[in-house]
Amino acid sequence: MESKGSWTVADAVDYKGRPADKSKTGGWITAALILGIEVVERLSTMGIAVNLVTYLMETMHLPSSTSANIVTDFMGTSFLLCLLGGFLADSFLGRFKTIGIFSTIQALGTGALAVATKLPELRPPTCHHGEACIPATAFQMTILYVSLYLIALGTGGLKSSISGFGSDQFDDKDPKEKAHMAFFFNRFFFFISMGTLLAVTVLVYMQDEVGRSWAYGICTVSMAIAIVIFLCGTKRYRYKKSQGSPVVQIFQVIAAAFRKRKMELPQSIVYLYEDNPEGIRIEHTDQFHLLDKAAIVAEGDFEQTLDGVAIPNPWKLSSVTKVEEVKMMVRLLPIWATTIIFWTTYAQMITFSVEQASTMRRNIGSFKIPAGSLTVFFVAAILITLAVYDRAIMPFWKKWKGKPGFSSLQRIAIGLVLSTAGMAAAALVEQKRLSVAKSSSQKTLPISVFLLVPQFFLVGAGEAFIYTGQLDFFITQSPKGMKTMSTGLFLTTLSLGFFVSSFLVSIVKRVTSTSTDVGWLADNINHGRLDYFYWLLVILSGINFVVYIICALWFKPTKGKDSVEKENGKGFSVEDC
């Protein structure tokens, strides 16, 4: 007969704070409710982002480069706010409350955007042929910004906790549930892609043919329904107690090491402080040895409690395990930095590539494809790549190499190569499009929009590899207690990629334009040299790839009993190159 403990999850509780009963809490039913709210979040955020540049240019009458930067700043802020959401979830609210609060904020943002696009007072008058267009007023732009950044705030809070709360529904100490958890992560990205697919097809079509206010209204109602369904699972969820922000631990280790910076390290690590010497979870490493000084025991490091027990002051003394956990986070940074450029190239797919599409012939018979819906090829590439990888590449790789698939670092490398190829394809197509534009006076150029498919497909396939590779890398190579933070760190690569795009657009616009020359990024892309901008990204991506390979070769996974769940092939070697 099984003990009562075998039917409960050791580190989880139910909604009343009791040990979580496996038969009554968690599992696929609750995970499905969580996946549902993520699908709606993707539907809303991507449905707005992929078609926003056309609204800003055609309705709000803003210049091309300004419109592109508004979109990338919006997306960048969305992912940057994941850090705020992760901090609140870890330190105060917990994942359940964080998801509930921030999903409500996102619903308010989409509702406000629906109103902003509906009321004539909140947008400039329509342009008539031959007349100068009146740009949006400061008040109209303020309303738009408030709506967008409410959505960004909601997205940031949601994304920081949604995958973690989903994994909380499975017990990683139960082999059966651990297998379900792995399947959950595999399907998590699939559901994200499905939400994006609905956004770039159904929602974008509604925006162009029915009205943006109706489309955004549907997003608002969908999120409201998803929130209600999510809350219906309150009694069935498994909850993990907040353990405090790992940011505090990082600062404690740094502060203790700085305090003892002039002290000499002992010859042997046995003289360094450890909470439980018999249960060291992470092997000591020689990298970043200056941080080891935080574990040197010195006078004044211990304080007496009221019971007379001596305990270490965490700002003066850290254990070897805590120091090694901080080292693990530091080791992630070079890989983190060299994946940012991918998301800069990704940003072009929802800004300038959509603008390119708006000038090209988009008809299939009598049906005219919305410019924003061209990103369907981007999403299709992701889904096809994931299917081919799961069904063909992984079995072949396992048979040939004896490994379950490409390592996380190998997948990231493949993603970087594909995105570079995608930008090269984009530059070549833009050269062709510009040559047609010079010889044509038509508003819609006599060139098929399907010439853009290769760039969407290559960057989309690249995302399938790099997103799953990054997620795997940042989760498996981070300390157990810092996985929410490491997920947030991963998502900041998306954020910074969008911000780098905005920065490059602004710099290129300023450097290449003069009083007599519109430069590379003209208000009308038919008069500029967008292809030069794409070639610039190809060069930057190539340089970044070389740096990435160096960083990947330098990276050494930390060995430990509990901190890192390693599989064959998680490392990176010269052979992997």
From Swiss-Prot:
Keyword Zinc annotated: no
Entry-linked Pfam families: PTR2
One MF term in the entry's GO annotations: symporter activity
GO biological process: nitrate assimilation; oligopeptide transport; response to jasmonic acid; response to wounding
Keywords: Membrane, Nitrate assimilation, Symport, Transmembrane, Transmembrane helix, Transport
S-S pairs: none
Tissue and organ expression note: Expressed in shoots, leaves, flowers and siliques. Expressed in leaf petiole.
Highest taxon listed in the record's lineage: Eukaryota
GO cellular component: membrane
Phenotypic effect of disruption: Wider leaves resulting from increased cell expansion. Lower nitrate content of the petiole and midrib.
Transmembrane annotation, as ranges: 28-48, 74-94, 96-116, 134-154, 183-203, 214-234, 332-352, 369-389, 409-429, 447-467, 488-508, 535-555
Matching InterPro entries: MFS_trans_sf, POT_fam, PTR2_symporter_CS
UniProt-listed CDD domains: MFS_NPF6
Keyword Transcription applies: no
Expression induction: Up-regulated in the shoots by nitrate, but no changes in the roots.
Subcellular locations according to the entry: Membrane
UniProt membrane topology term: Multi-pass membrane protein
Similarity annotation: Belongs to the major facilitator superfamily. Proton-dependent oligopeptide transporter (POT/PTR) (TC 2.A.17) family.
Physiological role: Low-affinity proton-dependent nitrate transporter. Not involved in dipeptides transport.
Protein's UniProt name: Protein NRT1/ PTR FAMILY 6.2
Organism per entry: Arabidopsis thaliana
